[in-house]
Amino acid sequence: MCVSRFSKIVPVALLLALSACATPPSHINDICAVFEQRDGWFDNWQDSAKKTEQKYGIPVHVLMATVRKESGFKGNARPKRTKLFGFIPWTRVSSAYGYSQALNGTWSQYQRETGNFTARRTKFADAVDFVGWYHSKTVSNYGVAPDDTFRLYLAYYHGWGGFKRGNWTPEIQKYARDTDDMARRYQVQLRSCGG
């Protein structure tokens, strides 16, 4: 009888555990749909983004447009692998990983400076906090306005050294314009879902 009861509890527990895992939102161009997403039962994406805005002064629409451009809201996103001899999967072009596509070194710097040593790039709340931290350092060190998505994204993509040099390719400027356009759309959409 105990075995029978246990065999019924295990599948239910597994189902509940799996239902708590986040899947990427299917409508990433609609911030209200994105904000219906949760990491587990308790971590609400909208609450996490608002907390980050309050902490660092970077508007929610800027934060979310950056995450959208970097990972498409996929928590396990990584750069594609290069190919050896044109067909054998080889190394990745960078160590970028997670929602924020933070590089290993920059993520370590974030953890040291914030004291958040348990932060994970695959957890949305941690990743959006990283984006806020990074953008706020760009604001304070380079005089970029907190709502200047175009310039914030250029610094995010190139790193602070590349941003300071200012030699951005037309392709990267297009990425930054696209991110700025998305931020503007998100800003308008936020009015209808409590942003």
Predicted feature descriptions by range:
Residues 1-10:
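Bacterial N-terminal signal peptides that target proteins for export
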Residues 23-195:
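Catalytic glycan-binding domains that act on GlcNAc-containing polysaccharides
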Residues 17-20:
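C-terminal motif of bacterial Sec signal peptides marking the signal peptidase cleavage site
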